[in-house]
Each structure stands twice: as C-alpha cells, then as structure tokens.
C-alpha cells in the first residue's frame, strides 16, 4: 500500500543526515508533495550542519588553551550597552561546561530574539558559572565609557562562583593577572564570549524594559537607551533622567 504524503513527510522529517536523506526509499517518490518535503528537510539539515561547523570553528580559541592547559577553566567575557544614551553598560562573565553544545551561539545582535531568549535560559541553567557586572551611567560619565566597560567586566569576573584560570575577552584588555586573550569581534569567534554576549544582552534589555515602566516617555523597552527618534524627542520634551549619560552627545550639549 502506498504511503500518503503526510506519512512520507513524517518519515523524511525523522532523517538526521543529508546522506541518509539521499538514500531514503522515498527519495525517488516523484509526487510533488514528497519532493517538497525532501527539499524542506534538506534545507533544514544543511542549516543545522552549517551551525555545527560554525560552532566547531568558534571553539578554536578554547581548544588552543586546553591543548597547553588541559585543566583550564576558561571564562568568556563580553559587554553590551556602550553606545546608548541611557542606562548602564552591562558585562557578563561565563564559564561553559566541558560538554557544551549551544548551536546558534553568535554575536547577540545577530541572533533572533526568540533564539536569544532560548539560549539565555539554557545557559543560565547549565553553565558552570556566570555573573554580571554593571557600570552605571554616573560611572560612565565619571570615567569614560572604555574605563567603565573595564570596570563592569572586572565586576563580572569578581562575581563568579568558580575562579577561572584563563580569560577570553571581546576586544578589551583588563588589568587582571589571569592569562587573557582579547579578540576583535570575539562574540562571533568564541563560544565562551558569544555565550557572555547573549546573557549580557538579555540582562540589559530586561533592565531597560523595567526602567521604561518608570519612564515610559523614552521608549526604553524598544530602544534600550539608544538615540531613536522617540527617545530624542522625549529628551527635548521633558529633559533627561538619572540614567542618562551626561557625557554623551547630544545630551552633553543640552546641559
């Protein structure tokens, strides 16, 4: 008895590799619905394979450390919030488990929000250790954004429940005695930094959403403190609040 297209599709969707798909008995079924199902499954498998290859590439720097130091405890560090006109700069320090496998990890700005939230929950529940560090708008104004970012990163490291032995940092160097590697675009090149990027992004977005409840005019829940049209119009209308960065333009020129 010939299987229905729905039944064949279920069989096809259970296939786990492209090779298996091409050798499947249904591969030669010429019905359009079956061929469409095969094409969809191939596309999904190709996407999954690309994510796996990307993930392997992003473990390069971790593996280089582990070659020389098999017992290394590697901490990835990243920040979000250097560019906004309001709110803190937030850093996260993350130590992944040895058997980590978080397909889709990348620079948090490139990860769709649904996937970002999914990864964040998995990371919070499964990593060896993580901690956040915050530098306030006042500290940003006092020290400058670069120094404030360093402060936030060090606070995140200090907050870890497990002491790392090596640091992988996104485009920064820290005054820290631990061996460290600074990587330009590290959140797209290292799984440890990418994990920290995701966690810092979700934490800061949540913070700004909460802030918007007290200051709804600025639209922080949508712009995260960046200088959008709504945000700038609100500043012109009602002025600034305590979490605005007075050293950032155009706010600086308004004072």
Swiss-Prot record:
Cofactor(s) named in the record: Mn(2+); Mg(2+)
Pfam families in the record: RNase_HII
GO biological process: DNA replication, removal of RNA primer; mismatch repair
The EC number(s) this enzyme carries: 3.1.26.4
Sites where the protein binds a divalent metal cation: 78-79, 170
Transmembrane segments: none
Protein's name according to its UniProt entry: Ribonuclease HII
Organism expressing this protein natively: Staphylococcus aureus (strain JH9)
């Amino acid at each position: 008895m010939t299987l229905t297209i729905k039944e064949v599709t279920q069989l096809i969707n259970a296939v786990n590799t492209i090779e298996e798909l091409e050798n499947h008995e249904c591969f030669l079924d010429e019905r359009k619905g079956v061929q469409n199902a095969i094409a969809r499954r191939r596309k999904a498998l190709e996407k999954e394979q690309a994510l796996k290859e990307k993930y392997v590439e992003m473990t390069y720097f971790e593996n280089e450390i582990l070659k020389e130091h098999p017992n290394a405890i590697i901490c990835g560090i990243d920040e979000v919030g250097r560019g906004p006109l309001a709110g803190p700069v937030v850093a996260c320090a993350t130590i992944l488990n040895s058997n980590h496998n978080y397909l889709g990890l990348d620079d948090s700005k490139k990860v769709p929000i649904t996937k970002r939230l999914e990864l964040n929950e998995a990371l919070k529940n499964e990593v060896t250790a993580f901690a956040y560090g915050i530098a306030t708008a006042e500290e940003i104004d006092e020290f400058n954004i670069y120094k404030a970012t360093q402060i936030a990163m060090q606070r995140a490291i200090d907050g870890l429940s497990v002491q790392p032995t090596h640091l992988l940092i996104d485009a920064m160097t820290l005054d820290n005695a631990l061996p460290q590697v600074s990587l330009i675009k590290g959140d797209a090149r290292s799984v440890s930094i990418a994990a920290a990027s995701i966690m810092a992004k979700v934490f800061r977005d949540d913070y700004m959403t909460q802030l918007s409840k007290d200051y709804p005019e600025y639209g922080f829940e949508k712009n995260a403190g960046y200088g959008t049209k709504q945000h700038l119009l609100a500043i012109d209308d009602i002025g600034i609040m305590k979490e605005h960065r007075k050293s950032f333009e155009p706010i600086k020129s308004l004072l």
